[in-house]
Amino acid sequence: MKVREAYKGHVIEAMSFELRDNPGFVSELFIEKHDSEGVTVTQFFVPGVFKSDESALQATVLIGRHKIDSGYAPRA
């Protein structure tokens, strides 16, 4: 499943995946920075296994917001 959310001039994309051999879900985080030069996408590792698809996505979006609020540096 995938969620995209606009946040403070960025786009947070959270993707979750169900594990095959174990119960639970893992997720990936991408943050897009849109500016006059185009779009820069930065990927982040999201630690942990989540009990549900929804909890994985919610946690990943919160991590994305924290990264933006903390002033991460987009990769060029």
List each model region and its residues.
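N-terminal segment of the canonical double-stranded RNA-binding domain
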Residues: 1-37
